[in-house]
Amino acid sequence: LLNRLPNGLFRVCLDLIINYVSGKIRHSFIRILPGDRVKIEVSPYDSTKGRIIYRLHNKDLKDSFFNFTIPFVGIQFEMKNFKKLIFFQEIDSELR
């Protein structure tokens, strides 16, 4: 827990989660590239693994709910419930 925000919200630091693409996305030939915002389901048995279930439309970084900065990787996410997260990963220009 990093800090408390208004309206009962909290800023929480999470570990990076290893994800795989769900069968529907793979079957539909939807391309997921670095920088895309996606919705994931986190496994109830292992919180370090998840599944990408939906690719969201990209928005401006200012519209994000939370913004954590980790060296070389920026992570933004919005908590929907305990099993689903909206997850966005952006590779910093230093890595390109």
Swiss-Prot record:
GO terms for cellular component: chloroplast. Residues 18-57 form the S1-like domain. The keyword Electron transport does not apply. Keywords: Chloroplast, Initiation factor, Plastid, Protein biosynthesis, RNA-binding, rRNA-binding. Its main location: plastid. Disulfide bonds: none annotated. It is found in: Plastid, Chloroplast. It comes from the Eukaryota. The keyword NAD does not apply. One of its GO terms (molecular function) is translation initiation factor activity. InterPro entries: NA-bd_OB-fold (IPR012340), RNA-binding_domain_S1_IF1 (IPR006196), TIF_IF1 (IPR004368). Component of the 30S ribosomal translation pre-initiation complex which assembles on the 30S ribosome in the order IF-2 and IF-3, IF-1 and N-formylmethionyl-tRNA(fMet); mRNA recruitment can occur at any time during PIC assembly. PANTHER family: TRANSLATION INITIATION FACTOR IF-1, CHLOROPLASTIC. Belongs to the IF-1 family. One of the essential components for the initiation of protein synthesis. Stabilizes the binding of IF-2 and IF-3 on the 30S subunit to which N-formylmethionyl-tRNA(fMet) subsequently binds. Helps modulate mRNA selection, yielding the 30S pre-initiation complex (PIC). Upon addition of the 50S ribosomal subunit IF-1, IF-2 and IF-3 are released leaving the mature 70S translation initiation complex. NCBIfam families: infA. This is Putative translation initiation factor IF-1, chloroplastic. The gene is infA.
